[in-house]
Amino acid sequence: MSNGFQMPTSRYVLPSFIEQSAYGTKETNPYAKLFEERIIFLGTQVDDTSANDIMAQLLVLEGMDPDRDITLYINSPGGSFTALMAIYDTMQYVRPDVQTVCLGQAASAAAVLLAAGAPGKRAVLPNSRVLIHQPATQGTQGQVSDLEIQAAEIERMRRLMETTLAEHTGKTAEQIRIDTDRDKILTAEEALEYGIVDQVFDYRKLKR
């Protein structure tokens, strides 16, 4: 019987496996095993579904032990600004420090989450990339007044993203605005220099 931990949708089928303990056997999967180790994995775009999953895990892990760090691994192309801010607020709300680690890429909304980790506990692997840019929105239609409302909301989101990134990188909001006017792609070392992360992790594998 499955343990009920929902895995992200993917064409790659993750294996389940059987664990034995003093309480018997149980079927589990890699995501459930990571959760037991207080690790959350964001491996999809940032949307309402993934945001709700991540927020629920953050709150549960806080309840289990409010004094132990939580680690958020990120490999995401980004996504919804409102979903991003929901995760961001929860990361700042919970008592445990949230470590962030980029594997592969942290683009757009995911880059903000990477930067929002606890100070000194944000990292990236050597060949990962980080991309920051201004928030995007779907094409709008309607009367002039509707378009004005949408334009004001886009500008509000942009200012919020700029001040959020500025807070966590040490850059000014004005510099963030200049840098995100177009896509800004950073290597691991450049993300470190920019202040999005605090360290570039080396490989665990021993070099021969």
Curated annotation (Swiss-Prot):
The active site is at residues 108, 133. One of its GO terms (molecular function) is ATP-dependent peptidase activity. It catalyses: Hydrolysis of proteins to small peptides in the presence of ATP and magnesium. alpha-casein is the usual test substrate. In the absence of ATP, only oligopeptides shorter than five residues are hydrolyzed (such as succinyl-Leu-Tyr-|-NHMec, and Leu-Tyr-Leu-|-Tyr-Trp, in which cleavage of the -Tyr-|-Leu- and -Tyr-|-Trp bonds also occurs). It holds the Pfam family CLP_protease. It is found in: Cytoplasm. Its EC number is 3.4.21.92. Its main location: cytoplasm. CDD domains: S14_ClpP_2 (cd07017). InterPro entries: ClpP (IPR001907), ClpP/crotonase-like_dom_sf (IPR029045), ClpP/TepA (IPR023562), ClpP_His_AS (IPR033135), ClpP_Ser_AS (IPR018215). Keywords: Cytoplasm, Hydrolase, Protease, Serine protease. It comes from the Bacteria. GO terms for biological process: protein quality control for misfolded or incompletely synthesized proteins. One of its GO terms (cellular component) is cytoplasm. SUPFAM superfamilies: ClpP/crotonase (SSF52096). Belongs to the peptidase S14 family. Fourteen ClpP subunits assemble into 2 heptameric rings which stack back to back to give a disk-like structure with a central cavity, resembling the structure of eukaryotic proteasomes. Cleaves peptides in various proteins in a process that requires ATP hydrolysis. Has a chymotrypsin-like activity. Plays a major role in the degradation of misfolded proteins. This is ATP-dependent Clp protease proteolytic subunit 1. It comes from Corynebacterium glutamicum (strain ATCC 13032 / DSM 20300 / JCM 1318 / BCRC 11384 / CCUG 27702 / LMG 3730 / NBRC 12168 / NCIMB 10025 / NRRL B-2784 / 534).
